[in-house]
């Protein structure tokens, strides 16, 4: 007798049995917003990167659990804050900067390897006797604070003159067997966020900063090929925990301001 239902036969979940459609990846077409309400820090909020897809999964065999969702990693980061002619502070990912790894996980720090565990993932517990249809979505943006004053100084005198940030990410849509850790890559997306802000610290609060360069971000690329996931993109630490804030003065040795967690 042939196999009638995959819940009773050990039918394997394969890529050709998974349907992915309506894949969408965009960055909002609005400029980065600058906030100058605090006498201590400048804040800026970038537009959102958004990704979504509809998925049809085949019936899940007994004793198997599959999670379908988004995994994201940072591939490159430059984040410099210049303070007049004194030097600059720099958020850095040392392993990435020195080429020891190709990517660092951008998980929420709880749901490894997934970007998050709300709209970002769907869990399917076998046995299921019919196909499953669902959507998964995620979004990401930057909303940091940068001190007006030199971060290693006791002074509150505003000296910030420039903020430059350039960060690249890879985002994967993945189906994963939670027991065997088998991964089926369903989609690969590349995107980049750039920020360039010029600051005149001599101006009054609320009139110091302005956006320079491009006002809109380039749109994400949905790749036609599936790019493999580097091992470091799946495990701790994530980018937030791995990053270190350095002070790099024009004269003298660099200092660690905030070490990695």
Curated annotation (Swiss-Prot):
Source taxon at top rank: Eukaryota
Sequence similarity: Belongs to the FAM78 family.
Protein name from the UniProt record: Protein FAM78B
The encoding gene: FAM78B
